[in-house]
Amino acid sequence: MTSKTLQSLLLGSLTLSSLVGLSSCNSTIDVDQERRSENERAFRSFADSAYTKATVPGIGGSGFVYLKVEKEGDKSIGVDYTDAVELFRDTYRTTDWLKDKFKATRLRQTLDMNAIEQEPVANLPVGLQIAVQNLHQGAEATIVIPWYLNNTTSTSERTDSYTSLYYRVRLKKVIKPSTK
């Protein structure tokens, strides 16, 4: 082999390996974007006749949650933003719930407890505020909240970015603010 042939082969090999190396750089996966897409698909999967879109004017813009009321509760006792509630709930990642149902890991578990502390509605994540204000005292429901209404600051329900949530809830009591 001549030195020119050897140089040509070496140059060709370097060019080919450079092209292969550069093309692999474009295949990075954006984990947050993947999680967002997966959670949006999971949320949209609840758009059927079993669930209704629930909204509250002035909360969350045009945002909505999916709500399926299992037990109506006392329709004479509704929930307002200024109320406090005794809200028993089990919280799951929507993607986990779709895969494993009751075997899914719970982010919060109070549904089976006998007593819990009351919480101001205003302190709940926005999506849960919307859902609760569409329920009545004594109601039981399942709720699906999109990632953009899951703005919880609670350390017991902390989630990754772009995580939609699935709730099983029982609204035991509505506590109206006292008037002075």
Language-model segments: residues:
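Sec-dependent signal peptide hydrophobic core
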Residues: 5, 9-17
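Cross-family detector of peptidyl-prolyl cis-trans isomerase
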Residues: 2-5, 25-180
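C-terminal motif of bacterial Sec signal peptides marking the signal peptidase cleavage site
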Residues: 20-24
